């Protein structure tokens, strides 16, 4: 398989700061070029595994920006863990959960069913488009393992052969029982 680092629209050159999960970053050729890559790889018997960053998004992510613009009135308020207003997204200590305390990387509230639905839809969409699996970034940062069980169920329902692997920097036995990762 060919493993691709994050390919979605991002504010960072490595694309771990995703702001649009539905489009391949133009610097990488946009969606049509990705589909061409998928077709060419598949025609040669190769598989494509995408890097899924589902613990956090970019500060440029629409739902996060909606909170910045609308505060407590935003319907997306519960998509993230926000601890006060006004939000300190650019100056001072952030008053929301962010990965490694980096203000540019707000952490999703993956306990929120709407967030789960969104992320599972993203995962299913790209499998439906022909991706063969996911390499999942920092899955251990999402503390509720039911998230990954549901993620697996949604992905495998779309393609039972989809490959799921997580970035686990420690003993991975618990993750490899057939209900989260392959």
Feature-to-residue mapping (PLM):
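The substrate-binding groove and active-site-proximal loops of carbohydrate-active enzymes
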Residues: 17-31, 101-116, 132-142
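Catalytic pocket of metal/acid-base enzymes, prominently hydrolases
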Residues: 92-99
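Conserved beta-strand positions in the central sheet of alpha/beta enzyme cores
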Residues: 3, 49, 135-137
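Aromatic-lined carbohydrate-binding/catalytic grooves of carbohydrate-active enzymes
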Residues: 1-36, 46, 145, 151
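Active-site-proximal helices and loops of the catalytic beta/alpha 8
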Residues: 38, 42-44, 56, 61-72, ...
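Aromatic- and acidic-residue-enriched segments that line the glycan-binding/catalytic groove
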Residues: 13-25, 54-92, 153, 175-182
């Amino acid at each position: 398989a060919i493993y691709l680092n994050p390919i979605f629209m991002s504010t960072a050159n490595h694309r771990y700061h995703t702001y649009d999960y539905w489009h391949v970053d133009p610097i990488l050729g946009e969606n049509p070029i990705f589909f061409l890559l998928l077709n060419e790889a598949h025609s040669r018997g190769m598989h494509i595994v995408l890097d899924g960053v589902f613990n956090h998004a970019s500060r440029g992510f629409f739902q996060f920006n909606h909170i910045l613009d609308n505060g407590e009135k935003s319907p997306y308020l519960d998509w993230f863990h926000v601890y006060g207003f006004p939000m300190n997204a650019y100056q001072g200590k952030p008053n929301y959960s962010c990965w490694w305390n980096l203000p540019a990387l707000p952490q999703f509230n993956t306990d929120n069913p709407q967030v789960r639905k969104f992320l599972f839809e993203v995962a299913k969409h790209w499998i439906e488009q022909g991706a063969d699996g996911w390499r999942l970034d920092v899955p251990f940062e999402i503390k509720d393992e039911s998230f990954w069980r549901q993620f697996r169920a949604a992905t495998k329902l779309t393609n039972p052969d989809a490959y799921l692997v997580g970035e686990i920097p420690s003993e991975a036995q618990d993750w490899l029982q057939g209900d989260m990762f392959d």
